[in-house]
Amino acid sequence: MATKTLKVTQTKSSIGRLPKHRATLTGLGLRRINHTVELEDTPSVRGMINKVYYMVSVEEV
């Protein structure tokens, strides 16, 4: 069975944010505004997205 993937896009800048939130964006592989990555839908990735929900948008692929 194929694994689900999520399309995560950074929508807001990380400037002036908490260092842990900036590190979370880096952990997700996001570098700049409008940068999009496709990640596996795992509990750890979901937790990282929940931490920075106000800076990213998520689509199920």
From Swiss-Prot:
It holds the Pfam family Ribosomal_L30. PROSITE patterns: RIBOSOMAL_L30. Keywords: Ribonucleoprotein, Ribosomal protein. SUPFAM superfamilies: Ribosomal protein L30p/L7e. GO terms for cellular component: cytosolic large ribosomal subunit. InterPro entries: Ribo_uL30_ferredoxin-like_sf, Ribosomal_uL30_bac-type, Ribosomal_uL30_CS, Ribosomal_uL30_ferredoxin-like. One of its GO terms (biological process) is translation. GO terms for molecular function: structural constituent of ribosome. Part of the 50S ribosomal subunit. Belongs to the universal ribosomal protein uL30 family. This is Large ribosomal subunit protein uL30. It comes from Shewanella piezotolerans (strain WP3 / JCM 13877). The gene is rpmD.
